[in-house]
Amino acid sequence: VLERCLERTLTRYAGEFVGIQEARALLYKMETHYAELVTEAVRVVSLQKIAEILRRLVSEGVPVRAMRTILEAIVAWGPQESSSARLSDRIRLAMARQISHRHARSDRVLPAWIATRPLEEALRTAQRNSENQPVRSGMPAPLSRALNGWFQQQLEALDSDLQPVVVAASDVRAALQQWLKQHDIDLPVMAWQEIAPEFSLQAIAQIRLPKPIPRRESEATAKL
């Protein structure tokens, strides 16, 4: 039990150990075989931004051993995506095979909890309403409570051998992942496009809101 708790803690905070020095070390190691690729990646995106991207990936449990794939995605999408968050999402798509492999069973099946369209729309509305607000206050209180209730109920009934992923639309994936992390729920969130072709999805539940959220309440954001 102690070993599992330690592993969860290290995984949860792993991103905090990735900075410019660590990014530079990874790039230096890559230069041995991919010097031109490293040079082009650093030309397109600053070292500071590369460090931020790696930090995002590590904090979401994405393996960064596939640095060639990461750098190729940076070269391809870096000129078009000024946001580190959006560029990180592009890199995740390029790493669909690695992400799927990390979370799938040995038979290449991904047990999953699927976000329903009403939930995704509620998350989009929350994102629009919180664009100019602090990140931690972006989730409306009723939506946060409803989500927390659903996840706690499902986790209590979940078979200990089952480790599901959460699947949601790409534009709300990061927000849902951040919310789960803030509430100490250690589940990876994948976008549909991140499921590699050779893997299959096993839907075991749909994430449904228990009842419509009153409009007046939904506008009051929770500082969670």
Model-derived regions: residue spans:
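Membrane-embedded alpha-helical signal segments
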Residues: 1-224
